[in-house]
Curated annotation (Swiss-Prot):
Subunit architecture: Homodimer. Homooligomer. Interacts with host RB1; this interaction induces dissociation of RB1-E2F1 complex thereby disrupting RB1 activity. Interacts with host EP300; this interaction represses EP300 transcriptional activity. Interacts with protein E2; this interaction inhibits E7 oncogenic activity. Interacts with host TMEM173/STING; this interaction impairs the ability of TMEM173/STING to sense cytosolic DNA and promote the production of type I interferon (IFN-alpha and IFN-beta).
Signal peptide span: none
One GO cellular component term noted in the UniProt record for this chain: host cell cytoplasm
Annotated SUPFAM superfamilies: E7 C-terminal domain-like (SSF161234)
Membership in a protein family: Belongs to the papillomaviridae E7 protein family.
Protein name: Protein E7
Motif Nuclear export signal per record, residues: 68-76
Gene3D superfamilies recorded: 3.30.160.330
Coarse class of the protein's main subcellular location: host cell
A Pfam family assignment: E7
Length: 93
């Protein structure tokens, strides 16, 4: 630097000395504990009324915790079950 004020070439030269190359490779390794587990299937007993005659219907399912919550939402809102007796009546309509 010559003179009282720094010029742009002087500043750029000073910055170039500070720039360090950065290694962008990831050397991280996952341990066995961090690997994703298989979803656990748990047996559940579902008891719901027939949508026509209110007789109890029992279902045994095997599901993940997420799966059983999804099934519950369906049975409470979008899907209704029909007993075998009412199914026969529907078949003849």
């Amino acid at each position: 630097m010559i003179g009282k004020e720094a010029t742009i070439p002087d500043i750029v030269l000073e910055l170039q000395e500070l720039v360090q190359p950065t290694d962008l490779h990831c050397y991280e390794e996952l341990s066995e504990e961090e690997t994703e587990e298989e979803p656990r299937f748990i047996p559940y007993k579902i008891v719901v009324p027939c949508c026509f005659c209110d007789s109890k219907l029992r279902l045994i399912v095997v599901a993940t915790p997420f799966g059983i919550r999804s099934q519950q939402d369906l049975l409470l809102e979008e899907v209704k079950l029909v007993c075998p007796g009412c199914r026969e009546k529907l078949r003849h309509v």
